[in-house]
């Protein structure tokens, strides 16, 4: 197959007594001599006691979600609170020093019917690298994002590593609903400001409208995001283009621990608003804090697979 377009798969990715104090023993005072015992009256017959009612078990206490501490929105005018929630959400999704995930990507719609790709994604901070291992014609293809303006790709049809231009970053990759720009959207609060609090409790979610910050080069001037109130994790995104028309949606499902000790969304679906074409990412495994070499985010890393 020939590759004409470049994009990225966003996997994913996210969002758990004090010792007893010894008492000092004080010696007891000597007891006073006992007074002579008074005659004891005969005991009255014992009154039968009704049997004790069985104890009603108490409901287990529900622990407050750790993730929600320190960030909340008081009312629809609380933009500062919403901004704090968005920043905490970013933190909850990026809880690692570095991360490696294995993902299967499935395309459906138009000419695609259950077309499947498999790849590994490596992330550290704002850097991200991807390497495909299946199907065979995609094996060795890779993408390295060192920053929003420095992206390199290795294309199987050319066997060369090339720097990706701005126009190419906005295009689809091999028919998927992801783009290279999507790959760089890791910390939302860095790129977007909260423009409006749409809802404080939409089925257990905060709903915010986000506006692209000045000077940020992304093709989505507006986003609508939903963040769970209990765990402060983002599980729904709407992307709007320059005409403020809905471009696509992203939904995240199946939050669970798959090996790192943290919960991540293991199924992510992106849907094109116009064509209804879908791309489903299934995260198969996750490893964190492996301290893999910084070389993972360089052109040399891509060249090694040639």
List each model region and its residues.
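Sec/Tat signal peptide C-region and signal peptidase I cleavage site
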Residues: 18-22
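Gly/Pro-enriched, hydrophobic low-complexity segments
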Residues: 160, 184, 203-299
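N-terminal, post-signal-peptide region of Sec/Tat-exported proteins
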Residues: 97-127
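Bacterial N-terminal signal peptides
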Residues: 8-17
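N-terminal propeptides/low-complexity segments immediately following signal peptides
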Residues: 23-61
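Flexible, processing/modification-adjacent segments and terminal tails
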Residues: 62, 68-88, 94-97, 104, ...
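Functional cores of ribonucleases/endoribonucleases
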Residues: 129-145
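Bacterial N-terminal signal peptides that target proteins for export
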Residues: 1-9
